[in-house]
Each structure stands twice: as C-alpha cells, then as structure tokens.
C-alpha cells in the first residue's frame, strides 16, 4: 500500500486523502469473501444458499459505507464464514453462527496481520431466495442488513484506528448508533447488558472512555510497531512492547470485566509468540509473558513461547 495510507497523518484523515490519484480511487472500503457452510442442513435445494452468498457479497462489496475514498488495493480484506445450523424454509429463517475476520497489510512487507477475529453465535436472520437487500442507516428494520452494516462499520473503524490514534471514532460511533437503533429487532445479540460478548458489548466497550488505552493500542501496535519492523525489527518490537505494557495493560486494569483484551490476545497469540520467540531481552520477555498470562491464561502454551 503506497498511496494515502502510506502518507497517513495522525492528525488528519483528509490530508491522507489528498495523496490519491482520482483515476485509481474506489469508493468501496471492503473486499469481503462470504462463505456459507450449510453441510448441517439436509434435504434442501442449495440454490437459496448460493443466492444468499452472492447477494451478501454484492451487498458488502459494492456499497460505499463511509465518505472515505479507498484505492482498490487499499480495500480492507475481510471474511465472513457463516455456518447454518438450522434452516426453516417456511419462515425463511436461518439460524447461524459466523466467524468474522479482517486483515491489515504491514508496510514494506508481504505480511498481513489480523485486525479482528471473533465468532458471533447469534447470527440469525430471515432471507428468501432472490431478496434484494436495501439498507437505511436511519431506519434499522432488517436483521440481515443490520448484521453486515454493524460489522462493516466495526471493521472500518478498527482499521482506521490502526493508522491514526482513534482514527475510526466517527465510524465506530455510527456502529454504536446502529446498535442502539437495532434494539427493537426481535433477534438475539443486540440487547444492552444481555451478554458480555454480544454485538452491543463489543462496540460499547470500544467506545468506553475507560478503554481508550485499548484504542490507542491499535495505533501503537500496528502503525508504530508492526509497520516499523520491516525497516528495523528491534525498534518495531520495542514499540510493540511499549504498546502492550501501556495500552493493553491499562485497558485490563481500567475495565477488568471487558472481554476486548481477551478477544484480542486470542487472535494475536501466534503473532505475539513469533515477535518475541528467540528475540529481545529476558527481562522484556518475562514482562510480556506475565502481562499476557494475566489477561488470557487459556493461551499459556503460546505465552510460553514468548519466553524461549
């Protein structure tokens, strides 16, 4: 990525947009791959699942979700792996769970890093074959479009946070507004305080002032840390250590019941182990090990690698 993202100003998103060539600008922000796994459903024509997949992929990828301008090679790579566990043909009702993943390229490198990876166990919606999807941000009355709009805003907001401190604030606020407007939808996953890992809890925590260190972590870890490692691995790792010891640690201290630090370390476990394994001082490695273990002891086999 060598256009506006490479000249991103921490103080102004607009300044970065000036770097774009009009001939290469694309309005769409996402490049999503939608996968529908319906192996658990027997005796049903697969046409409805194929049509659902095609309709969703067009809906997500062809829509301009924000006012921002992305070049084609800057679109955020993301995946929605939807597993259908129950299908009621008469009601057009799909009961599903979904794995949502988004990636971010690392500057001056062929490496891509995971921005977000989490399972939504309440991915239930209605869809009839050949339905046309329309989305009105001001009137949330369709569960399927609300689900994908939620994750579109969440992914774009997190991505922007990784290029400027709280750079995704406006987009994440739109995600929160959508979630508030979805409270009247008769589907699980939206309700405030019903579940500490549902859609409401995730976006509410991202915008919680007590978790601002977690937001800052996104910039410090990616932009100051990973993006620096191709030029100077030692300096990049030092920045990552500082990001973890301030942003991640402070977020856990400020909101010990928030699951954001745990979710983040769940999908960062391999990357973190590789960053520190066989590298850095023993003091640095011990400090990072203790921090990661205190946040997510279930991944201790990966944290043990940090100390090697």
Language model regions located:
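Start-of-domain marker
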Residues: 28-95, 106-108
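A cross-kingdom marker for long, charged
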Residues: 35, 222-308
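Second-shell loop/turn segments in exported
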Residues: 39-46, 134-142, 254
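Sec-exported extracytoplasmic/periplasmic mature domains
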Residues: 57-65, 157-161, 273, 277
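Acidic/His-rich structured neighborhood in mature extracellular/periplasmic domains
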Residues: 90-204
């Amino acid at each position: 990525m060598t256009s506006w993202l490479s000249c991103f100003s921490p103080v102004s998103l607009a300044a970065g947009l000036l770097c774009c060539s009009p001939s290469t600008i694309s309005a769409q922000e996402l490049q999503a791959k939608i996968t529908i796994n319906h192996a658990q459903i027997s005796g049903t024509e697969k046409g409805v699942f194929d049509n659902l997949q095609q309709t969703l992929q067009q809906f997500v990828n062809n829509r301009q979700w924000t006012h921002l301008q992305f070049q084609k090679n800057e679109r955020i790579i993301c995946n929605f792996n939807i597993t259908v566990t129950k299908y009621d043909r008469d009601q057009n009702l799909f009961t599903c769970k979904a794995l949502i993943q988004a990636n971010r390229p690392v500057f001056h490198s062929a490496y891509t890093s995971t921005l977000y990876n989490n399972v939504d166990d309440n991915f239930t919606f209605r869809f009839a074959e050949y339905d046309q999807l329309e989305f009105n941000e001001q009137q949330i009355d369709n569960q399927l479009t609300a689900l994908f709009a939620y994750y579109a805003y969440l992914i774009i907001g997190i991505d922007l946070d990784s290029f400027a401190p709280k750079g995704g604030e406006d987009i994440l606020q739109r995600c929160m507004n959508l979630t508030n407007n979805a409270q009247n939808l008769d589907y699980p996953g939206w309700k405030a305080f019903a579940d500490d890992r549902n859609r409401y809890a995730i976006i509410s925590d991202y915008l919680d002032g007590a978790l601002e260190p977690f937001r800052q972590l996104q910039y410090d870890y990616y932009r100051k840390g990973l993006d620096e490692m191709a030029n100077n691995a030692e300096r990049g790792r030092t920045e990552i250590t500082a990001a973890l010891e301030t942003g991640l640690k402070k977020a856990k201290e400020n909101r010990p019941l928030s699951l954001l630090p745990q979710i983040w370390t769940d999908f960062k476990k391999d990357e973190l182990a590789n960053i520190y394994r066989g590298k850095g001082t023993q003091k640095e490695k011990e400090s990072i090990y203790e921090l990661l273990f205190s946040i997510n002891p279930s991944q201790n086999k990966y944290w043990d690698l940090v100390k090697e």
